[in-house]
């Protein structure tokens, strides 16, 4: 009998396809589809470690979107974009700017005669490389422990994608129980999705809007009360259920007493000019204010109290950056240089800090050649997107489909072991698309789910060391079939250490 040959595919030649557990069972075109789809997929909030891993997930996890320390540096100052004091109650993570001295350049070395160099690294709260889809950064312990005077090595990760877990594994999707069947809904690459699975697979969307107002129209008090005038939601707060973020009202002579009553200013009417977010359950994540007075303030007193608070917070942020720069200048005189990012930040700060009194040079803020209104507020908000009809799903084998229906959990098929189907798809497409490895993954995952259930039930009934060893050896026999190399690795482990842990 001929001996079977084992061919090893080199990960360096497979590139992204090395994340596929069964690349030998996928046609070239389908493998290429997986490579393109994984770059288009947004991070899933319920992401999981893949059940059948290739060993390359952690390596790819090193190159996902991250905020890293660019050089070996010593922290000079940590500046939060919004300070902790004040009257605004911010209930959300806030951006942070870290000022550091580059210890690989100039003043960081006795042998290097170049001047000391200082730079900044900005830790944002979210990443948005798409006009809608993005994710909230997860700050690492290194970021949470930043303080003046400590040294940070180059490439220290300060914030990472939520797709990376604490072990460094790249979780680019979510495991699913897939049923291949001849349901009428799954024709033409249709997919039926379990509602509970969809709810656990949400991803982040973002929206932006710019609001402007001055004395011609008054901003409404849509988020305040009789004592607090609040014209838009604060950072971390949800947008109203009707989606109105901000609205202004044009005053009509003779109707001022009606239009400007406390109750009227807290009510949005169809005749008002409103900025509306179409997405549900949206939450504000960023507010940026530009104040461009054209002489005497035109907005009625008190109606601009909220944007003035944000303006003051912005000025405090830039004042602290300027203070850090002044401290560097006092220590080093003129014998230092700034990174382009730090230089640009200071210039932007001067624009925000300049006074607008009569004895100072005025700055004119324009957009597309036209002067801005007295107040301009840029609001960024985030919201959860739940997969639903019209969304596209894909797997590691180039298998894909469009959701045509979402069924309640109790309507989905259940197998003899009580496993509920998460996704229903057409099995015939596997033959048509030449990606039979889809069935490999489904069958092996189902087999090991049953194996796991059997082992757990057996150990519950008999927790002796003898039975534990028996179940361990039985599991090794399954590994011998699926991955002999992995089985050899597991055999080197003392199974009884698991009992102690």
Predicted regions and their residues:
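Short, well-ordered loop/turn and helix-capping segments at boundaries between secondary-structure elements
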Residues: 251, 409, 445-449
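Long C-terminal interaction/binding lobes of large macromolecular proteins
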Residues: 440-501
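Conserved nucleotide-binding/hydrolysis micro-motifs of P-loop NTPases
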Residues: 184-186, 252, 291, 399-400, ...
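Single-stranded RNA-binding surfaces
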Residues: 379, 390-392, 400, 404, ...
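Flexible glycine/proline-rich, aromatic-decorated loop/lid segments
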Residues: 125-129, 403-420
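Helical mechanochemical/support elements of P-loop NTPase systems and associated helical scaffolds
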Residues: 151, 238, 280, 386-389, ...
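Intein-associated homing endonuclease modules of the LAGLIDADG/DOD-type, together
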Residues: 176, 185, 192, 197, ...
């Amino acid at each position: 009998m001929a001996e079977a040959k084992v061919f090893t595919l080199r990960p360096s030649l497979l590139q992204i396809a090395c994340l596929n557990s069964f690349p030998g069972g996928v046609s070239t075109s389908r493998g290429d589809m997986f490579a393109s789809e994984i770059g288009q997929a947004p991070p899933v909030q319920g992401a999981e470690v893949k059940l059948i891993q290739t060993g390359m997930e952690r390596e790819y996890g090193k190159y996902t979107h991250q905020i890293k320390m660019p050089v070996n540096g010593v922290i000079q100052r940590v500046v939060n974009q919004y300070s902790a004091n004040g009257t605004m109650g911010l209930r959300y993570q806030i951006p942070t700017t870290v000022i550091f001295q580059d210890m690989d350049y100039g003043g960081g070395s006795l042998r290097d005669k170049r001047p000391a160099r200082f730079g900044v690294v900005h830790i944002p709260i979210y990443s948005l490389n798409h006009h809608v889809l993005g994710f909230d950064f997860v700050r690492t312990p290194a970021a949470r422990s930043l303080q003046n005077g400590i040294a940070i090595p180059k490439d220290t990760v300060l914030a990472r994608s939520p797709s990376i877990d604490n072990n460094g594994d790249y979780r680019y999707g979510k495991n699913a129980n897939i049923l291949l069947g001849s349901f009428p809904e799954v024709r033409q690459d249709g997919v039926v999705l379990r509602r509970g699975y969809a709810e656990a697979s949400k991803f982040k969307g973002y929206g932006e809007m710019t609001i402007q107002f001055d004395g011609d129209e008054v901003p409404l008090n849509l988020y305040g009360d009789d004592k607090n005038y609040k014209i838009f939601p604060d950072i971390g707060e949800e947008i109203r259920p009707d989606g109105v973020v901000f609205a202004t009202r044009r005053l009509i002579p003779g109707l001022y007493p009606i239009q400007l009553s406390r109750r009227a200013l807290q009510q949005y009417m169809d005749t008002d000019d409103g900025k509306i977010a179409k997405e549900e359950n949206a939450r504000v994540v960023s507010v940026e204010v530009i104040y461009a007075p054209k002489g005497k303030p035109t907005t009625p007193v008190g109606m601009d109290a909220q944007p003035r608070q944000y303006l003051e917070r912005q000025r405090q942020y830039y004042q602290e950056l300027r203070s850090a720069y002044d401290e560097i200048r006092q220590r080093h005189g003129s014998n230092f240089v700034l990174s382009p990012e730090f230089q640009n930040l200071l210039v932007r700060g001067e624009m925000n800090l300049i006074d607008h009194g009569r004895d100072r040079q005025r700055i004119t803020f324009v957009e597309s050649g036209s002067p801005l209104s007295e107040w301009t507020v840029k609001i960024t908000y985030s919201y959860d997107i739940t997969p639903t009809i019209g969304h596209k799903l894909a797997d590691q084998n180039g298998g894909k489909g469009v959701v045509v229906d979402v069924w309640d959990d109790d309507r989905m098929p259940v197998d003899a072991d009580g496993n509920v189907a998460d996704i229903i798809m057409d099995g015939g497409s596997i033959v048509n698309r030449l990606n039979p490895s889809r069935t490999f993954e489904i069958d092996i995952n189902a087999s090991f789910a049953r194996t796991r259930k059997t082992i757990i039930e057996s150990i519950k009934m008999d927790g002796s060391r003898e039975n534990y060893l028996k179940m361990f050896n039985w599991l090794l026999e399954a590994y011998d079939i699926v991955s002999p190399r992995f089985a050899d690795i597991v055999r080197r482990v003392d199974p009884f250490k698991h009992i102690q842990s």
